[in-house]
Amino acid sequence: MVRSRARVLDAVASLLVEKGVRGVTVDAVMARSGVARATVYRHWPTRQALVLAGLRHLLPPPVPRTAADGTLSQRLTSVLGGLARQMEVEPWAHAIPALLDAARREPEIATVAARFVADRQAPVRAVLQEAVADGSLPRLDVETALAQLLGPLVYRRLLTSEPLDEELCAHIVEHFLRGQSSQVTRPLR
C-alpha cells in the first residue's frame, strides 16, 4: 500500500511539472503510476485532494516559523530567506504558475492554491502580527504588508533570472521597515 501511494504521488508530481494542473487527471495518474482507479480514490477522493497531495510531495513544506528572538529585521529577513530558498527549488518554477493559472478557471483548484499560498504566508504573517502586538510596528494592513514583502520575491522568481538570496531579502525588509518607521512606537531594529 505504501509503495502504491508513493507511485501515485510520484506520478502526480511529474504530471504537475510536465503538464501543469490540467494534466493531473485520475486517468493520467493511473496510466503513469500503474495503480488502479479504486486505489487512487481510496486515498484521494477528489482531484483537488490528489493535486494538493502532489504539490505537497513535489514542493518543500512551508517555511517553519522562526524563533521570537532577534530583531524584527532579522526575523523578517529569516522568514523571507527561507521562502526564497524554497522558491529556488526547480519544481517551483513549473508547478506554481500552473497552479495559479488553473485556480482562475477551476474552483476546486482555487481552494488548493489558496491553501498553498496561505501556508507560505503564515510565517511572515505571524512575525508581522507579533510586531504590531508588541509595538515594533504600527497597526497596518497585514495583506498589504505581505504583498510588499513577498511581491518582490515572486516577481523576481517568475519574471527574471536574477537569484533570490539573503541580500535581496535583507534589502526588501530594509525598505519595508523604512516605510513603516514614521509610525513606529518602538525602535525597528
Which residues does each predicted region cover?
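Hydrophobic alpha-helical connector segments
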Residues: 63-93
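Amphipathic alpha-helical packing segments from all-alpha helical-bundle domains
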Residues: 70, 74, 94-97, 107-133
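Basic, helix-initiating cap at the start of DNA-binding domains
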Residues: 1-32, 38, 49
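C-terminal peripheral helix-coil segments that are non-catalytic and often amphipathic
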Residues: 78, 122, 126-133, 138, ...
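All-alpha amphipathic helical-bundle segments outside canonical DNA-binding/catalytic cores
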Residues: 111-116, 132-148, 166-167
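Short, basic, alpha-helical segments at the C-terminal edge of helix-turn-helix-like DNA-binding modules
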Residues: 55-61
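A short His-aromatic
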Residues: 41-44
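Amphipathic alpha-helical segments used for helix-helix packing
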Residues: 51-55, 87-114
